[in-house]
Regions:
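Short, Lys/Arg-enriched N-terminal segments with co-localized hydrophobic residues
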Residues: 1-4
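RNA substrate-binding interface of SAM-dependent RNA methyltransferases
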Residues: 16-122, 183-184, 191, 195, ...
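Structural alpha-helical scaffold elements that stabilize or flank donor/cofactor-binding regions
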Residues: 53, 130-131, 150
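Short beta->alpha connector loops at strand-helix junctions that form conserved
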Residues: 68-69, 94, 141, 158-165
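Short, hinge-like loop/turn segments at secondary-structure boundaries
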Residues: 81-86, 132-135, 177
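Structured adenosyl-cofactor binding patch, chiefly the S-adenosyl-L-methionine
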Residues: 151-196
C-alpha cells in the first residue's frame, strides 16, 4: 500500500510564502471537511450545472466529487465554480464505455452505500434519510436522470419533497438542498465524520502548493540548496 509522506521541512519552507490568515483559513476549512458523504455526477450534459455542483460541494465541506462521463465530457467552468475545483479531489471516469460500473465498484470498495437521487416509488424523503452510513449520492443527467445500472445497484433512493406542478429541480439546486440537509444533521451528530489527521495533512500540503505562484521553481530552489 502506497503511503504519502510529507516533507515537513519543505512544507515549512513553502509556508513562508503564505500569510498567517491564509494558513489559518486552510486549517479552519479542513476541520469542516468530510468524506462521509460524496457526490457522483453521471453524464451531466450542461458543464455549468456540473461546475455549480462542484462549488456546492466545497461550500458544504464535501471533499470528493466523482464524475462519470460515458456520453458527455465534464469540464469544470472556472467562472461558475469560482475556483472551488482547486480545493476538492475530483475523480473522473471517462476512459471506458462501462464507466458507471467502474465508478460504482470503486465507491463500494471505499465503503460507500449507493443512493440514487430520483423520484422512485421506494424513495426515502430527504428529511427522513439516515445519515449514519457513508453515502455516495448519485445525480443523473438533466433529462434522463440516473442510469438503469445505477438504479439496479443502488442501495436506496432519495427524493426531495415537492408540492408544485413541476416535478424536477435543476441538478445544482437539488445537490445544494440535499447537502445542506445531510451535512447539517451530520455536524450535530456523534458520527465520526471528520477527516483523519493524515488526510488533513495531505490536503493542507496540497493546498499550500496550489496557492503559491511558480511553486515548481520554488521547490527546485529548495532542493538545490539542500
Amino acid at each position: 500500500m502506497f503511503v504519502f509522506m510529507i516533507d515537513e521541512k519543505l512544507l515549512a519552507y513553502l509556508e513562508a510564502y503564505l500569510t498567517e490568515k491564509r494558513k489559518t483559513t486552510f486549517k479552519n476549512v479542513l476541520e469542516h471537511r468530510t468524506r462521509h458523504f460524496t457526490v457522483v455526477l453521471e453524464d451531466i450534459y450542461q458543464p455549468h450545472n456540473a461546475s455549480a455542483v462542484v462549488r456546492t460541494c466545497d461550500i458544504f465541506g464535501v471533499q470528493d466529487v466523482y464524475s462519470i462521463e460515458n456520453k458527455y465530457s465534464n469540464t469544470v467552468s472556472r467562472h461558475v465554480a469560482k475556483g472551488s475545483q482547486k480545493w476538492l479531489n475530483q475523480y473522473r471516469y471517462r476512459e471506458d464505455g462501462n464507466n458507471t460500473q467502474i465508478c460504482l465498484d470503486a465507491l463500494k470498495e471505499k465503503g460507500y452505500q449507493i443512493i440514487a437521487t430520483t423520484p422512485h416509488n421506494e424513495s426515502c424523503l430527504l428529511q427522513d434519510f439516515d445519515i449514519s452510513k457513508k453515502t455516495a449520492f448519485i445525480l443523473g443527467a438533466e433529462a434522463e436522470g440516473v442510469s438503469d445500472i445505477v438504479k439496479s445497484q443502488a442501495d436506496g433512493f432519495l427524493k426531495i419533497p415537492m408540492v408544485g406542478f413541476t416535478e424536477s429541480l435543476n441538478i445544482s439546486v437539488a445537490a445544494a438542498i440535499i447537502l445542506q440537509s445531510v451535512t447539517t444533521k451530520l455536524r450535530s451528530s456523534k458520527i465520526d465524520w471528520q477527516l483523519s489527521t493524515k488526510e488533513k495533512e495531505i490536503l493542507y500540503f496540497d493546498w499550500v502548493k496550489k496557492t503559491i505562484k511558480n511553486v515548481d521553481k520554488i521547490e527546485e530552489r529548495y532542493f538545490n540548496n539542500l
